[in-house]
């Protein structure tokens, strides 16, 4: 029985190249559709694929066609209404029809087309969702105590496994060896062939000499052919070696206010922000740890499940979370070896005497050691003392950023604003 094995890169997805070209060509429209769709999802369904719709007019391409003027002769087979030389009135183009997602006004005439809708995968969705985003001020530090290595190409070697064989380099060595081993014989062969050509046309004929030359030529050709086309001496393998790499390990502190002033809608918006942050970190970076801290009057380090699903609540003392973060940094994360980040979400409601203490802890202990600290206030009310204290920090520290979220639609734009990739002249 004959077996066919499909080793093509695309395999079953034979239109992958065309699909990628389409995504590149209409990236702006797709990203706009994704940014609108992210706010309509449930908290637990942020990272799945998405049905993307693009207006038909945006994907139309230029084409050559005949002009509207003039007379034309056409053959319409199968009609029973017209005969030869009948003139057919040209139909008027409809301009009042519906087109798009069904959100327009009704029309009694005209034609249109629905928006073009297609499905993108989870990977494509996340790639577009987090495109052009990065952790600010990320630096690579050489960790003495961390044995982190990366494999690099390091030329060629004469020993290795068949999977690493370099066909081109092996054939080059084979050609060089065969040329070196047969060069003298080929020169001698060329001389004998020239001599045989001269003798064969000479008069009188020298049959014995011709026979001798033919024997020598045959022997030389046999010797040349006995040189193997490729030998184990010719084989070369791609060589790889492990080199110590600068480590870009980072830790992200997620500080969420779960006090009684945070209603369920506000908590859901905070969770949406942190889920986006978690997906961004896990999608973009390999060596990023996440520390989850929930706080009301007391702060507690928790795991991922408790951070998102615990129902515990209480009063509001924001400084408790900042103190706990400072303790964890001193205990586990040396600023000289770690890139430290923090994202704090709150409704801004805090005990009045505690807000100046938050300012002091951030200014003296945390901001000098973190790469970037972001504060997100989720409220529709007027800003209170915590926001005003943080405004002074923003004016003093370049690595402190703050944003205001009023509604669910603000989450993704604020997230992109906080983690927008810096240009070369802006990076530290």
UniProtKB/Swiss-Prot annotation:
User: Taxonomically, which superkingdom?
Assistant: Bacteria
- What species is this protein from? Salmonella dublin (strain CT_02021853)
User: Where is the segment annotated Disordered?
Assistant: 78-111
Protein name in the entry:
UPF0229 protein YeaH
**Bias category Gly residues: which stretches?**
92-103
Q: Which stretches are tagged as biased composition: Basic and acidic residues?
A: 78-90
Which family is annotated? Answer: Belongs to the UPF0229 family.
Write down the Pfam families for this protein, in alphabetical order: DUF444
